[in-house]
């Protein structure tokens, strides 16, 4: 027996080229078929123009929820939805990271406010409590260990600590399993298929099913005599596989747990969309003799070869002296072997354009110092190409461009993407600088052309080496 609610923590948009090409229509239709009942609005929902988001909201046969997004002073989405499940009244409210405004293009969020989550929750929770037995928050704010959110906006832990009366948070955004090793200590070595202990803060359970559909999170609760009790929780791997070496020395991929069979109705729904995407994106454009590193955990923490490639491609196209690449703009690695246009779009899915700005040497130093302060682990983390430097305590020294020491009186051309140029990720806004030019060159197209021109790529040519030293 029992009853269920199927919820999502947001970010349906961006990252899968076949989906991006089709404005996530196949994703929303698939979610409709699965019977989703509500989702939080994620920051990536604003990667495309508002007309696309509003089309998606109409397409979804379930509410997209966010209590803290306001358009022209009014809530853009429903703040919550009340469900009656087995005679129990359950209120599901939605919240979106306050960082959204700096994670997307400014023109996509014009006249939109991302208000304080805790302030909005302090209003919504009492309102819901008067109507329901159980309060759940579907959020896209992130799970930060012990509430240590650094330069990011507050996440689920901080929400639970600040606002009493939330029974469960179903979260997203930080892309981790949110399994705990001890109180306020994340299990950073979680193995798929093993026990996952959810976080608990101020009487609120907090769960997050990692990323990209790798898991379905299942939380079983009982409600008796006014008490909402967690009976068990599991992260169920969705056909995740691990490499296993056989007696013959060959490595094969084996499921962590029992394989889940394809659903014929879902397959029939999605196959035409997949075929259309493959037709458009499966063209081989080049090859690389080695892996070019762009994985999230690497590119947001230290210099990475794929970011160097992206920066050099942008420099080549715009005749710039150096490039700064925000780590959040690098979404995947390029494996050794053939490279398709789809691979490029997985790396750079946002359709950003390249911006150039001609700066004096002293202006360059100011900008580099600002970039150097971008925190490790965030999408703002700065990657560099064409420049060598040392960073110590957030200060930049020993800057060399074109292998020569930085000259305060000389003019240098910097290339970044238009998102950074307009102040995205907290970068200094340079779009109003007298020399700023939005070239209109789309980043993925520039990378594609560079790969075609220089293929086969020699991975060794793009290794960051010791060009950027952090002390």
Residue ranges and their predicted role:
Residues 1-4, 130, 230-231, 238-471:
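Non-catalytic terminal accessory segments
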């Amino acid at each position: 027996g029992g009853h269920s609610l199927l919820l999502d923590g947001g970010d349906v948009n961006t990252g899968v080229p076949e989906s991006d090409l089709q404005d996530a229509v196949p994703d929303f239709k698939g979610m409709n078929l699965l019977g989703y009942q509500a989702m939080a609005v994620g920051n990536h929902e604003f990667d495309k123009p508002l007309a696309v988001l509003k089309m998606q909201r109409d397409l979804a046969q379930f509410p997209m929820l966010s209590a803290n997004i306001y358009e022209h002073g009014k809530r853009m989405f429903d703040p919550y939805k009340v469900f009656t499940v087995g005679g129990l009244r359950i209120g599901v409210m939605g919240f979106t990271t306050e960082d959204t405004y700096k994670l997307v293009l400014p023109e996509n969020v014009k006249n939109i406010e991302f208000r304080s989550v805790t302030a909005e929750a302090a209003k919504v929770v009492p309102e819901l409590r008067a109507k329901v037995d159980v309060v759940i928050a579907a959020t896209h704010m992130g799970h930060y260990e012990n509430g240590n959110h650094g330069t990011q906006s507050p996440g689920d832990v901080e929400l639970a600590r600040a606002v009493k009366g939330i029974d469960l948070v179903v979260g997203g955004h930080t892309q981790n399993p949110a399994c705990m090793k001890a109180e306020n200590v994340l299990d950073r070595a979680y193995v798929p298929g093993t026990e996952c202990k959810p976080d608990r803060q101020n009487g609120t359970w907090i769960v997050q099913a990692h990323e990209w559909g790798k898991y379905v999170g299942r939380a079983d609760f009982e409600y008796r005599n006014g008490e909402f009790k967690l009976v068990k929780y599991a992260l169920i791997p969705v056909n995740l596989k691990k490499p296993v070496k056989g007696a013959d020395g060959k490595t094969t991929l084996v499921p962590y747990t029992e394989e889940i069979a394809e659903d014929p109705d879902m397959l029939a729904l999605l196959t035409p969309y997949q075929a259309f995407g493959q037709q458009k994106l499966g063209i081989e454009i080049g090859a690389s003799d080695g892996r070019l590193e762009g994985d999230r955990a690497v590119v947001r923490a230290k210099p990475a070869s794929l970011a160097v490639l992206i920066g050099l491609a942008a420099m080549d196209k715009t005749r710039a002296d150096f490039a700064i690449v925000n780590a959040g703009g690098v979404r995947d690695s390029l494996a050794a072997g053939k490279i398709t246009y789809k691979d490029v779009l997985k790396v750079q899915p946002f359709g950003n354009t390249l911006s150039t700005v001609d700066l004096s040497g002293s202006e360059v130093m100011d900008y580099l110092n600002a970039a150097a302060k971008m925190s490790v682990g965030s999408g703002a983390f700065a990657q560099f190409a064409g420049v060598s430097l040392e960073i110590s305590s957030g200060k930049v020294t020993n800057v060399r461009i074109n292998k020569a020491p930085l000259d305060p009186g000389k003019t240098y051309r910097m290339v970044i993407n238009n998102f950074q140029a307009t102040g995205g990720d907290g970068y200094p806004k340079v779009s109003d600088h007298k020399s700023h030019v939005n070239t209109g060159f789309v980043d993925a197209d520039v990378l594609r052309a560079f790969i075609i021109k220089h293929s086969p790529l020699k991975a060794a040519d793009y290794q960051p080496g010791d060009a950027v030293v952090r002390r």
